[in-house]
């Protein structure tokens, strides 16, 4: 269970030793005030997965605590020691809708017409309150706009990179606004995967987990089902000299021009459709860049020719390189990685480009007021110029991703013609990507249109990343790691495919079989299947897992997402049962130490159950002793030893303990200590001494006689 620890010398639990931290971890409450010293503060920060607010010594923590008090209780996402994001927003108390999504910047004036008159849209990029406008503005627009996709494609608003103004009455606007605000601020009283509370928690902890995973793995990975949320992590991973085999699924289906045109005319416009064009250029840019990493490694330099307006450039402030942009139309970009030259890039500039650079070309001549004949002539001249540039650049061992046009008759494509999915406009564009000089292939106009129409049904991940579907026959290098975050668990994948991935070094996520009740009170199953019920979450259906049966079968580590984050500096304080499980099979640092995934909170399930029914601890000791003798005086003489309460917790509450520790790691450490009981650990938490083999055997006798578990890890621990 994730906890919020508030360090405050005026009140709280005294935490002066590592044993005090162990005791604190077994307290039942989520929010705890603590009085620490420097050593115990360091242990809490580094050796637990708790969110720590030092309100006396850290000004940012004091600000965060004040905000937390005004929002209490709320989820907290810590991206570093002091950079935090809360799960809700109080800017609404001033009638302000707060957003951070840069693609809204050019639309704010028109988007404001979709809100009640007394409400404002404000952009705050680094607020600790959650930017609910990123979601709310999608909803109000989608529910109030009356334009079709086809009407928008031919509108002035599209050319201006904005949205049409709202034409609904204030009464209707208020009705829709009330609906979405009621949804966003609906108090969560039960597990509800359709709630905003759940959506925010899953989105943000997913981002933290992706960051942690990609900082953990090195070398070559097989990446299964990556979504666009992983784009930043993928680029940073490749830029660090690593490599990836992508596994995605092509969902393209054949279609016809009439069918797609009819779809545009009948389908109501949505915000997602509005943003397609900006996202198209961004996705094309990164598709070509990934191709460069695969072919040449880290690019010497990165160029963007024909950059105006490219509002998406504000979304990628994280890129680990500068982007040299050329376009005579200048726009000030709020991204210090962009170096903009407000002039044309011409053939003479090619000589200045270093080899093994990456160039994205998206030159567009303004032809809006020209007749058809002139347009066609300009399109042909522009296409010839772009192709000439691309070939000359490719001859220098550069990767070039460049825009092309479809012309009547035969067309010369350099490599495969590339078509972005989900495009709203049935235009005449496609892209080529080359890394060296290649001979062109001939395509008829009709063939290119057929590919364009089919691509509309493909998914963006497959387009950007490429790769093939992962299945039970996929070949995985023994030195590679399989990474499957929120993907492989989908029920479109067979259990044979999933088990094939689990065999290798891996990091794979699954939902837990339990989503209601209290994490400390999860009953053991009477079957041995690792995979349980299919679970619907948001728009997906996943295989859920039972952690104990899973670990017994596959012999790999399993922890919740919150516990997993302890490997780095990020933390997540969310409802416990919102956590997904993370399956791990890989070499880990300090595996036999309390540095990571230690047994904090191991007593919580037993304390929770005992306290719920006012059961004395003495009852537990007597119950164990009666397994072997009715002489209860032995308990005092042995100081209540002779059995392992921790092992009882592991065996009876394994599927609960994954929310606070790694029970599998505890077993492996305990086995190690049976043969080497004087292992020194400077990270030790708790004063307990290693158990003997006899104590473990006594414990298993107790579990068996009292029929407390259906299956055990006895062979793993004692054989």
UniProtKB/Swiss-Prot annotation:
Keywords: GTP-binding, Methyltransferase, mRNA capping, mRNA processing, Multifunctional enzyme, Nucleotide-binding, Nucleotidyltransferase, RNA-binding, S-adenosyl-L-methionine, Transferase, Virion. One of its GO terms (molecular function) is GTP binding. One of its GO terms (cellular component) is viral nucleocapsid. It is an enzyme of class 2 (transferase). It comes from the Viruses. It catalyses: a 5'-end diphospho-ribonucleoside in mRNA + GTP + H(+) = a 5'-end (5'-triphosphoguanosine)-ribonucleoside in mRNA + diphosphate; a 5'-end (5'-triphosphoguanosine)-ribonucleoside in mRNA + S-adenosyl-L-methionine = a 5'-end (N(7)-methyl 5'-triphosphoguanosine)-ribonucleoside in mRNA + S-adenosyl-L-homocysteine. Multifunctional enzyme involved in mRNA capping. Catalyzes the formation of the 5' cap structure on the viral plus-strand transcripts. Specifically binds to GTP and displays guanylyltransferase and methyltransferase activities. Together with VP1 polymerase, forms an enzyme complex positioned near the channels situated at each of the five-fold vertices of the core. Following infection, the outermost layer of the virus is lost, leaving a double-layered particle (DLP) made up of the core and VP6 shell. This is Protein VP3. It comes from Rotavirus X (strain RVX/Human/China/NADRV-J19/1997/GXP[X]).
